[in-house]
Structure formats: structure tokens, C-alpha cells
Amino acid sequence: MRRTKIVVPIMLTELTELEKVSVSDYHSADIVEWRADFLSADDIFEMAPKFFEKFKESKILFTLRTVREGGNIQVSEKKYLQILQEILKFDPDYIDVEYFSHGPSFAALKNYREKIVLSYHNFDEVPTDLTSRLIKMHEEGTAFVKVAVMPERECDVLDLLQITRDMTLEYGNHFISMAMGDLGRLSRISGYLTGSCWTFASLENSSAPGQISLKETVEILDLLENELA
């Protein structure tokens, strides 16, 4: 049995695409992530009831990844909060909130801490203040804390692994971390060492550089973690 949960994103660009999605393709995933930032706000609102009905047997993470953190949608703080509040009416298992980009929205959603994956994405580097950022995010008391950063050299990946391990030992097993790009692939399958509790895998199109396919991720984690659970 695997320790690390596998999250697989679904990135739909048109309302009609949902009909073509086969739920059975995601059976190997522990969590389905609806990356809604490829749709307009109005289309998100229209698709939401259909999406949650279609994946009612799955655990769902809702993510609205903004341009500022590597995503595809640019919205005001007010609109960002409005979208998240509307989605919460459908009772998702988890909802991503960009902590440093949308602090006011997080403040308005603190009553949903048990559902929140508090996130931070840096597509330029592994920041030198990453540990202090993780501590600050941890102190907010959300279900999970997620960071995705871009390594420039091998030691950046090793630093992230060590930081994740240190945070897990000190504060508990609710951290999700990954180094992006091909250089960072090791971080996506080393949760059994670092304590990172989720990894993100792709079914077809990856949602982040360096993402490994669902099939390969299942095979690798089964090999690495099967005797550890």
C-alpha cells in the first residue's frame, strides 16, 4: 500500500470537453484535481455542478491557478474569492488557496481550514526564505501546505528534500513539496523519504514541468513504497 497520494489534474478549456472525460481513466488516482483556470469565471460556475456530479465517487481538489503563480487565469481579489466561495457550495474535499498571492481571500476562508491546501509556487528559483515561508503557512492551521519551486542546479533539489524532511519531522505530515522541471523529478517520487504526502501526475497533458505520467508514477511508488506502509 502506498503512503504517497497521487493527484491527477484535469484541465478543461471548454464546457463541452467534460462530456468526453472518462472517469475510469482516473481510477488509479487518489485525488482528482480540477484545474479550472483554463475556463472563464462564468464557465466555471456553469461546469461546477456537472463536474462534481461526474466525479462524485472521487476525492476532488479544486484549483484556480492564477497567472502570478504559473497558471492561466488573471482575476481580481474579489473575483478570486467569489469563485472559491461558489465552489465551496459543492463541498469539495480540498480547495487550493494561493497564500502569498491571495492573502485576503485566505483570511475570508479561514473557517474552511480543514479543506484548504495552502499553496506557494515559484517558477524562477528555490527561494532562500523557503523554510520561513513554510513555517508561516503551517501556522495557519490548514489541512495541507504545498510548495512547488524551480531548481537551478542539483543542490537545489537536495535542499528542498531536506527542508521538507525537516518540516515534516518538526511539524507533522501535512506538507506537499516538489521541485519542478526534469531536474526536480526525484522530488515527485521521494515522499517516502521526505514526508511529502502528495505527488502530482499527468494523465495526458501535464499541469507543471517535470510531471510524471500517472501510469509511471503508480509503478514507481508501488515499487518504492509497497513494503513501507
UniProtKB/Swiss-Prot annotation:
Keywords annotated in UniProt: Amino-acid biosynthesis, Aromatic amino acid biosynthesis, Lyase, Schiff base
InterPro entries: Aldolase_TIM, DHquinase_I, Type-I_3-dehydroquinase
Chain sites annotated for binding 3-dehydroquinate: E33, W34, R35, R65, R188, S207, Q211
Enzyme class: lyase
Biological process annotations from GO: 3,4-dihydroxybenzoate biosynthetic process; amino acid biosynthetic process; aromatic amino acid family biosynthetic process; chorismate biosynthetic process
GO MF annotation list: 3-dehydroquinate dehydratase activity
Active site per database record: H121, K146
Metabolic or biological pathway, per its Swiss-Prot or TrEMBL entry: Metabolic intermediate biosynthesis; chorismate biosynthesis; chorismate from D-erythrose 4-phosphate and phosphoenolpyruvate: step 3/7
Superkingdom, natural source: Bacteria
Family membership: Belongs to the type-I 3-dehydroquinase family.
NCBIfam families tied to this protein: aroD
Function: Involved in the third step of the chorismate pathway, which leads to the biosynthesis of aromatic amino acids. Catalyzes the cis-dehydration of 3-dehydroquinate (DHQ) and introduces the first double bond of the aromatic ring to yield 3-dehydroshikimate.
HAMAP family: AroD
Record protein name field: 3-dehydroquinate dehydratase
